[in-house]
Curated annotation (Swiss-Prot):
Matches recorded under SUPFAM superfamilies: Cu,Zn superoxide dismutase-like (SSF49329)
The EC number(s) this enzyme carries: 1.15.1.1
Source superkingdom: Eukaryota
Per UniProt, location of the Glycyl lysine isopeptide (Lys-Gly) (interchain with G-Cter in SUMO) cross-link in this chain: K19, K70
Residues with the Phosphoserine modification: S26, S39, S99, S117
GO terms, biological process: cellular detoxification; cellular response to oxidative stress; copper ion transport; fungal-type cell wall organization; intracellular copper ion homeostasis; intracellular zinc ion homeostasis; negative regulation of cellular respiration; positive regulation of transcription by RNA polymerase II
Phosphothreonine sites (modified residues): T132, T138
GO molecular function: copper ion binding; oxidoreductase activity, acting on a sulfur group of donors, oxygen as acceptor; superoxide dismutase activity
Reported effect, G123K: Does not enable copper chaperone-independent activation
Binding note for cofactor: Binds 1 copper ion per subunit. Binds 1 zinc ion per subunit.
Official protein name in the record: Superoxide dismutase [Cu-Zn]
Keyword Glycosyltransferase found: no
Organism, as annotated: Saccharomyces cerevisiae (strain ATCC 204508 / S288c) (Baker's yeast)
Length: 154
């Protein structure tokens, strides 16, 4: 069993923890999250980005992690980035909490997400269904109020 965590921090009052757990390379990864400081009753884009770099804030995390060179999509779409985790939904207090399993996100093997960044966005991800070229790259999810590097835990 491999476990990893990303502690999300930023300059907009958004913070949280995202945990990852994978039993073997062929098994799906369980992702659980609790993120506070968002707008209440909203959906916010939630992605794994290519770089584990926060030297210039969350913008240094680069684009979505996309080792297979696909276009952006929903987590349930066949064509999507590995880093496309869709949207998180906040409650009346601006807290998003939940978990899901994902077969493309790996902690083990050549497409491991360890050392990359989790980013929570300021806007809703259109899941690649928008009518702009940017939709197929980013989902038009907007600015990056918080991020954190995915690191192994014991």
């Amino acid at each position: 069993m491999v476990q990893a965590v990303a502690v999300l921090k930023g300059d907009a009052g958004v913070s949280g923890v995202v945990k990852f757990e994978q039993a073997s390379e062929s098994e799906p990864t369980t992702v659980s999250y609790e993120i506070a400081g968002n707008s209440p009753n909203a959906e916010r884009g939630f992605h794994i980005h290519e770089f584990g770099d926060a030297t210039n804030g969350c913008v240094s995390a680069g684009p979505h992690f996309n080792p297979f060179k696909k276009t952006h999509g929903a987590p349930t779409d066949e064509v999507r980035h590995v880093g496309d985790m869709g949207n998180v939904k906040t409650d009346e207090n601006g807290v998003a909490k939940g978990s899901f399993k994902d077969s493309l996100i790996k902690l083990i093997g050549p497409t491991s997400v360890v050392g990359r960044s989790v980013v929570i966005h300021a806007g809703q991800d259109d899941l690649g269904k928008g009518d702009t070229e940017e939709s197929l790259k980013t989902g038009n999810a907007g600015p990056r109020p918080a991020c954190g590097v995915i690191g192994l835990t014991n």
